Swiss-Prot record:
Function: Plays a role in viral cell-to-cell propagation, by facilitating genome transport to neighboring plant cells through plasmosdesmata,.
Cytoplasmic-side segments: 1-16, 98-120
Localisation: Host endoplasmic reticulum membrane
An example Gene Ontology CC term for this record: host cell endoplasmic reticulum membrane
Keywords: Host endoplasmic reticulum, Host membrane, Membrane, Transmembrane, Transmembrane helix
InterPro entries with a match to the protein in the record: Plant_vir_prot (IPR001896)
Transmembrane segments: 17-37, 77-97
Full protein name: Movement protein TGB2
Lumenal topological segments: 38-76
Note: TGBp1, TGBp2 and TGBp3 seem to act together for cell-to-cell propagation. TGBp1 is the main movement protein that physically cross the plasmodesma with the viral genome. TGBp2 and TGBp3 would facilitate TGBp1 function.
Species assigned in the record: Lolium latent virus (isolate Lolium/USA/US1/-)
Main subcellular location of this protein, as a coarse class: host cell
Lineage: Viruses, Riboviria, Orthornavirae, Kitrinoviricota, Alsuviricetes
Amino acid sequence: MSSTSEPTYQLAPPDSLKQVYLTLAAGFAVGLGIFLLRTNTLPHTGDNIHHLPHGGCYRDGTKSIRYNSPGVATSSNIFLPAVAVLCILALLHVPFFQPDRVRRRCCRFYWCADPHHPTV
């Protein structure tokens, strides 16, 4: 047996961690991109053979299906929810724009603007 001395290598930290972080960021970005491109958020319609995720109709001898595409409003009143929210907000703010005498009379809480209250 002859003993040959093999060189010993020691691991040393990299001079800069910039390359490590850049590689991790690139891998994360690629993984996130693949995940987002493969995710299907459309509703499942149809059966195990016929899928209509973008809307359409199918009919054969025993069954028929009709599905409107997502994103198409079925109602002509698409502004009705927005108008309802604005009306509710307006009704909630009406008491704040009335004179103080009306507000004092209908307010029952201790923080009302009452001139006879000792904190005012």
